[in-house]
């Protein structure tokens, strides 16, 4: 089965200079992938020419005449820039012309555009942003929400857990992954009323609920999934990124203080290289916008080509493993058990409709 990925080529801090090389590099490693490059055709073709990939058989260009900047407010993205590369890329997923969309663009705009174009799945009130954070176990902890919903109801946290459970089960091949609820302590009496009520709902659910976890448990790998509201999750993520940069800077500073420390660095290089590979932030680039009727992956805005390629892989893996179908089924099963609504229609297969944007 061929997996088509729509790339918002104009998004992020670096635009086509990062997105196009990343897409071509990904194709060289995955024979069953195709790239739909969305944006200004001349800019995209110029990059393809540099890469000697102008006539690549698994690359198509879809024209978009506008670009959403990192500073554009949500209103501009939704109401004024209707032919932006971001929106056209997301529309490729809606029309079944791509299995996933990857963008390094404005997070708020991407969430708003994706929710407007794709809509949420039946049974899901709010989409959530999920990503993987490295842990001691080596596989990474899936954490959500990371900023889409600053204020949540207990039921939202339960929905987040179900969405993450479905994704981890098929992408990481872990049936019944463990779920932790981020709190200020492990005891059930800890936390505000929303968190305590969410804990009750999770304990009564079909999920493999471990209980409350604290911030350090994310890095210990105590559970496969950690659930929290978007305010707490975003603070935790940004704190993690800041700490990682500080530690890296301090290590570099200490090893370059003198000729002796430089010698020690040379001796320790094999160990440092292995550590760097384990903690390489590029490997964890790409946050999934869960709860929508299509796959959308948000890359870090400042990502380089290597890092953006990992975001593409996240979308590719999710599409190949049927994440949307799994989430849809999970919520349909709960609705059926409760005599509720039926499942949402699954995303159509690529190639279902012609596109007016093909350049």
UniProtKB/Swiss-Prot annotation:
Any Pfam family: FA_synthesis
Renumbered residue ranges of the record's region Disordered: 338-359
Keyword hit for Nucleus: no
Functional pathway: Lipid metabolism; phospholipid metabolism
GO annotation terms (biological process): fatty acid biosynthetic process; phospholipid biosynthetic process
Gene Ontology terms, MF aspect: phosphate:acyl-[acyl carrier protein] acyltransferase activity
Record field: catalytic activity: a fatty acyl-[ACP] + phosphate = an acyl phosphate + holo-[ACP]
EC number of the protein: 2.3.1.274
Subcellular location as annotated: Cytoplasm
Gene Ontology cellular component annotations, sorted alphabetically: cytoplasm
Keyword Ligase listed: no
Protein keywords: Cytoplasm, Lipid biosynthesis, Lipid metabolism, Phospholipid biosynthesis, Phospholipid metabolism, Transferase
Gene3D superfamilies: Isopropylmalate Dehydrogenase
HAMAP family named among the record's database cross-references: PlsX
Function in brief: Catalyzes the reversible formation of acyl-phosphate (acyl-PO(4)) from acyl-[acyl-carrier-protein] (acyl-ACP). This enzyme utilizes acyl-ACP as fatty acyl donor, but not acyl-CoA.
Subunit structure, as described in the record: Homodimer. Probably interacts with PlsY.
Family of the protein in this entry: Belongs to the PlsX family.
Protein name: Phosphate acyltransferase
Organism of provenance: Cupriavidus taiwanensis (strain DSM 17343 / BCRC 17206 / CCUG 44338 / CIP 107171 / LMG 19424 / R1) (Ralstonia taiwanensis (strain LMG 19424))
